[in-house]
Amino acid sequence: MKKIARITTQKKHKNRYNIFLQTPDGGDAYGFSVDEAILIEYRLSKGMELEDEMISILEQKDTLHKAYTLTIHFLSYRMRSEKEVSDYLQKKEVDEEHIAEIIKRLKKEKWVDDQQFAEMFVRSRINSSSKGPKMIQQELFEKGVDGSKITSALEQYPVEEQKQKVEKLISKKLQSKSKDSHQKRIDQIKQNLMQKGFDSGVISMVIQQMDTTEDTDREWEVLQLQGEKLLYKYQKKHSGFALKQKVMEGLYRKGFSFDMINQFIDQSLQDE
């Protein structure tokens, strides 16, 4: 049995207290420290006698409280998923038993709620990014959110809203300068949008509804540029029909139409 000799406030942390225990010679020595919440909960005061088992319990309670306080600070920046909180506490080397207890308390107090987190996450991604539902789904999955909760949260991202975002992204891409054929640009845009997490069906639907027809003058200008490059590349080793075939195949792979390719061949290789 040990008796509390005195209790002092820590200089740097006013909500923490040092507990000094009485020594056999009538003096005192530092025993342990606790948070104010623990001090109040167990009504610790000068003269109180503590068994070794109780001191151990108080130290464990304080360790748990410090980890809990640390987690609240972590959550103060933004809402987190249960897995994010667990990963954070593991990095802080908190015992698994304490982690489970902290998360249980946080869920009870609504600090941690994966359904609410998923809904806020989806809305944030819709408003501040160009990501589609599949990519958002993957992000939430990596954060440990349950599949049913993800599905429910993604209801905030209906097809019509996806189409609006896809249309804006396509328009922006088509306005940028490019040395590629119109068809190749469309294919690249489709691929890019799928990588962002949009469904191919939604992308195709938007492209069909939009006026994405090629600018003939620009297409011809780009074809001539690409065609001249191919001629320069192949005419050192090929001539006649073989050269025409190489150039035609190269331009076709780049997405140009047969009519334009033939027009270029007729104009550029008429003497071959």
From Swiss-Prot:
It is found in: Cytoplasm. Its main location: cytoplasm. The keyword Cytoplasm applies. Transmembrane segments: none annotated. GO terms for biological process: regulation of DNA repair. GO terms for cellular component: cytoplasm. Keywords: Cytoplasm. Gene3D superfamilies: Winged helix-like DNA-binding domain superfamily/Winged helix DNA-binding domain. The keyword Cytoplasm applies. InterPro entries: RecX_HTH_1st, RecX_HTH_2nd, RecX_HTH_3rd, Regulatory_RecX, WH-like_DNA-bd_sf. Modulates RecA activity. HAMAP family: RecX. Belongs to the RecX family. This is Regulatory protein RecX. It comes from Oceanobacillus iheyensis (strain DSM 14371 / CIP 107618 / JCM 11309 / KCTC 3954 / HTE831).
